[in-house]
Amino acid sequence: MKGSYKSRWVIVIVVVIAAIAAFWFWQGRNDSRSAAPGATKQAQQSPAGGRRGMRSGPLAPVQAATAVEQAVPRYLTGLGTITAANTVTVRSRVDGQLIALHFQEGQQVKAGDLLAEIDPSQFKVALAQAQGQLAKDKATLANARRDLARYQQLVKTNLVSRQELDAQQALVSETEGTIKADEASVASAQLQLDWSRITAPVDGRVGLKQVDVGNQISSGDTTGIVVITQTHPIDLVFTLPESDIATVVQAQKAGKPLVVEAWDRTNSKKLSEGTLLSLDNQIDATTGTIKVKARFNNQDDALFPNQFVNARMLVDTEQNAVVIPTAALQMGNEGHFVWVLNSENKVSKHLVTPGIQDSQKVVIRAGISAGDRVVTDGIDRLTEGAKVEVVEAQSATTSEEKATSREYAKKGARS
């Protein structure tokens, strides 16, 4: 009896423990189910989760320019060298000792300016001798003419023969010939004396002297005394491809002088402006180019002989052309294209047909219109339809630095 009583209590205790365990099990399961919707909702509201947590980074910064309509000049370009209009080596035409130089190296001189002097003593002596001989022979001629006049009277009275009259006539003629020779000798001596004073044959700039005062010089010296280069005006000889010849000839036929500009080696500074002078009469078969000569007044001495320059010749002007910065024009598998911005700052690729272009701007013949906005910088980050941030040129770097800083901040937070 006592044993069965204990067995019943054991069964009761086991049942109670099982009931408590079941209660806690079902209570925990219900808590998990009720917590799941809240956790999901919280995740959706969290900045780090859902769509808001996966939003894209900052907009790509770009620079843009507006296509404009303007008149665009068409230039032909070539490489060339400045050449003097005339180059003269000043030499002495007589032999003698150089006693004076009357120029400063590098100065501008005019035709007729005295440059140098050779000792004139010997030439003065020769002139005096020639003049003396001329005077002597003139006196002889005067006496012969008087004798001839007397002979002409005496022959009428037969006091002199006809033969004597003819002889006297021949003497007069001979003396007249001698006078002419004497006059030529005087002129030659005077010329030699004049040549002892050496003058500039042309206007121009004198170079460095080739001989010093005191030296004996002669007319056969090849180096001369000094070289004069005529730089007012001055010429530019440059080359153009043979394919441009027809364009130049057509522009010449229009009747207006073609303007030629001379630019420095780096093509960054305009040195002077002149006009086309002539085309060569044949093409260089080796290079396929033709030589062209232009002339410049060069009153400011901006150009020097043998100076290397870049030539630009204006041959035409294209009116009402659509122009954009050259930086906006890109090349792809499909050809040339530009990125065009719409009113919402979204970009789209437009295929275009380029025309005249230089380092700064390019004419677009088809593909866009005046007023369209095109991307000029930040092009490598673009995709079709992407929205961008248009920034000023001076702030583009700042925008990129800000974007980079944000990216680094994100990486730091994740790490």
Swiss-Prot record:
It is found in: Cell inner membrane. It holds the Pfam family HlyD_D23. It comes from the Bacteria. GO terms for cellular component: efflux pump complex; plasma membrane. Residues 399-415 have a biased composition (Basic and acidic residues). Gene3D superfamilies: 2.40.30.170, 2.40.420.20, 2.40.50.100, Helix hairpin bin. Its main location: membrane. Coiled coil: none annotated. Keywords: Cell inner membrane, Cell membrane, Membrane, Signal, Transport. Residues 32-59, 392-415 are annotated as: Disordered. It is a peripheral membrane protein. One of its GO terms (molecular function) is efflux transmembrane transporter activity. Residues 1-21 form the signal peptide. The keyword Manganese does not apply. Induction: The mdtABC operon is transcriptionally activated by BaeR. Belongs to the membrane fusion protein (MFP) (TC 8.A.1) family. Part of a tripartite efflux system composed of MdtA, MdtB and MdtC. The MdtABC tripartite complex confers resistance against novobiocin and deoxycholate. HAMAP family: MdtA. This is Multidrug resistance protein MdtA. It comes from Escherichia coli O17:K52:H18 (strain UMN026 / ExPEC).
